[in-house]
Amino acid sequence: MAARYTEAVLAALGVLSVCSASSSSGSGASGKAGGEAEWAEPWDGAVFRPPAALGAVGMTRGLGSPPPGNAETVDLPVLLWWSPGLFPHFPGDSERIECALGACVASRDRRARADPRTRALLFYGTDFRAADAPLPRLAHQSWALLHEESPLNNFLLSHGPGIRLFNLTATFSRHSDYPLPLQWLPGAAYLRRPAPPLRERAEWRRRGYAPLLYLQSHCDVPSDRDRYVRELMRYIPVDSYGKCLQNREPPTVRLQDTATATTEDPELMAFLSRYKFHLAMENAICNDYMTEKLWRPMHLGAVPVYRGSPSVRDWMPNNHSVILIDDFESPQKLAEFIDFLDKNDEEYMKYLAYKQPGGITNQFLLDNLEHREWGVNDPMLPNYLNGFECFVCDHELARLDAEKAHESSPRDIPVLEPHIAQLSHMDCPVPTPGFGKVEEIPENDSWKEMWLQDYWQGLYQGEALTAMIHNNETQQSKFWDYVHEIFMKRNKNL
């Protein structure tokens, strides 16, 4: 991921500093679709000696903490941020952090990798490139993954061999070690914001506005949403802004800036509030992957017409607050239902009942918002970057204690078994067409050429890096040889 993306992440989280970053290299060998075989782990306990996950932890930071390098930090475990440009501290290359179980030193100095005190490497998923992974993998170090962004940024992590390279995870999945499924939802109050009066929206309809809004400038994505919207437009008016399927110009120059479309700019929010229904379609389909495309319409009092996380019902404020595209057998049937709601105010308002006092009845959602230890623009809580960092710190402190206990009594206290991430920590299936069947799409279709190949190449790359670690390889330059060998073995019968 280029430097501007990591800077944007830090800025959005309110981190004080952003160190300069260089662009990470991409990878692009082609691959053909083939099922992911049952994966037998090719390593044994000697290859990995990291750890078991420990429960939720807190994070506090003392402003007067001494700088790393003196007697108070010399024996502390080191956490090394490996991704360029992502280091949530200011200033310098290292900082002592105070967490629930004790202190660690966070660093971005890659020279520390070989130091026995360096207990964990922290990777940002979008930046992680198997071809550039630090080799050989050192037996005493955990690998920790932060990947709250779209799976399209790195499909290696959507396969078992890729995600199981890591010991600790912070992803959008509720099943990850440090889950971030509600990263785009500040709190329940965000959902309770009053909706505009229906008479105002009726006036916009009389002025020629469609009932349904589509605002996208990221086209040709793995979810193939534009293909579905194009078909839906045959049956119901859709006002499409942005670069994808555009049929209307935003009313002001400011709103024509695509950078504004992902913000909560007051002018943008007022404009979007004119619409009763918003097409809310994620760029990729994974359980628990939900973004502002879902939450922003609800904040504005519009009804999301949603395709994205298959588990989205688990997170809704009640059982009648979103229209799910996949509940309808065709775009035509969906269009007919939206048209019905558009003409029946009483039925439409049932979708906004969660905004009334006591209207949020989903206790699972409320509990997750209340008990998460990180916050969204909350000065009383750490952001999830620092929160995950402390989670890793406490994990490594506990692992050190377990190792010491085993050394003191090896017959009575067994070696701590390594904790390995599972496929459920991402849970992203192979991309499918937004409309129609994959076999009906021409082979030269841009979606088919790009995303199916990218998805399956992620599998090959994860298998290649796993094999290199198992073989204790030290030369990154051999990576593509491994990929080629795996590709040939998988496709030898084609």
From Swiss-Prot:
<feature type="glycosylation site" description="N-linked (GlcNAc...) asparagine">
    <location>
        <position position="167"/>
    </location>
</feature>
<dbReference type="GO" id="GO:0036071">
    <property type="term" value="P:N-glycan fucosylation"/>
</dbReference>
<feature type="transmembrane region" description="Helical; Signal-anchor for type II membrane protein">
    <location>
        <begin position="8"/>
        <end position="24"/>
    </location>
</feature>
<dbReference type="GO" id="GO:0036065">
    <property type="term" value="P:fucosylation"/>
</dbReference>
<keyword id="KW-1133">Transmembrane helix</keyword>
<feature type="disulfide bond">
    <location>
        <begin position="390"/>
        <end position="393"/>
    </location>
</feature>
<keyword id="KW-1015">Disulfide bond</keyword>
<dbReference type="Pfam" id="PF00852">
    <property type="entry name" value="Glyco_transf_10"/>
</dbReference>
<keyword id="KW-0472">Membrane</keyword>
<dbReference type="GO" id="GO:0008417">
    <property type="term" value="F:fucosyltransferase activity"/>
</dbReference>
<keyword id="KW-0328">Glycosyltransferase</keyword>
<dbReference type="InterPro" id="IPR001503">
    <property type="entry name" value="Glyco_trans_10"/>
</dbReference>
<dbReference type="GO" id="GO:0046922">
    <property type="term" value="F:peptide-O-fucosyltransferase activity"/>
</dbReference>
<dbReference type="Pfam" id="PF17039">
    <property type="entry name" value="Glyco_tran_10_N"/>
</dbReference>
<feature type="topological domain" description="Lumenal">
    <location>
        <begin position="25"/>
        <end position="494"/>
    </location>
</feature>
<dbReference type="InterPro" id="IPR031481">
    <property type="entry name" value="Glyco_tran_10_N"/>
</dbReference>
<protein>
    <recommendedName>
        <fullName>GDP-fucose protein O-fucosyltransferase 4</fullName>
        <ecNumber>2.4.1.221</ecNumber>
        <ecNumber>2.4.1.-</ecNumber>
    </recommendedName>
</protein>
<keyword id="KW-0808">Transferase</keyword>
<dbReference type="GO" id="GO:0005783">
    <property type="term" value="C:endoplasmic reticulum"/>
</dbReference>
<dbReference type="InterPro" id="IPR038577">
    <property type="entry name" value="GT10-like_C_sf"/>
</dbReference>
<dbReference type="GO" id="GO:0005789">
    <property type="term" value="C:endoplasmic reticulum membrane"/>
</dbReference>
<feature type="topological domain" description="Cytoplasmic">
    <location>
        <begin position="1"/>
        <end position="7"/>
    </location>
</feature>
<keyword id="KW-0812">Transmembrane</keyword>
<dbReference type="InterPro" id="IPR055270">
    <property type="entry name" value="Glyco_tran_10_C"/>
</dbReference>
<dbReference type="GO" id="GO:0050714">
    <property type="term" value="P:positive regulation of protein secretion"/>
</dbReference>
<keyword id="KW-0325">Glycoprotein</keyword>
<keyword id="KW-0256">Endoplasmic reticulum</keyword>
<dbReference type="GO" id="GO:0046920">
    <property type="term" value="F:alpha-(1-&gt;3)-fucosyltransferase activity"/>
</dbReference>
<comment type="pathway">
    <text>Protein modification; protein glycosylation.</text>
</comment>
<comment type="similarity">
    <text>Belongs to the glycosyltransferase 10 family.</text>
</comment>
<keyword id="KW-0735">Signal-anchor</keyword>
<dbReference type="InterPro" id="IPR017176">
    <property type="entry name" value="Alpha-1_3-FUT_met"/>
</dbReference>
<dbReference type="GO" id="GO:0000139">
    <property type="term" value="C:Golgi membrane"/>
</dbReference>
<comment type="function">
    <text>Protein O-fucosyltransferase that specifically catalyzes O-fucosylation of serine or threonine residues in EMI domains of target proteins, such as MMRN1, MMRN2 and EMID1. Attaches fucose through an O-glycosidic linkage. O-fucosylation of EMI domain-containing proteins may be required for facilitating protein folding and secretion. Also shows minor alpha-(1,3)-fucosyltransferase activity toward activity toward biantennary N-glycan acceptors. However, this was tested with a library of synthetic substrates and this activity is unsure in vivo.</text>
</comment>
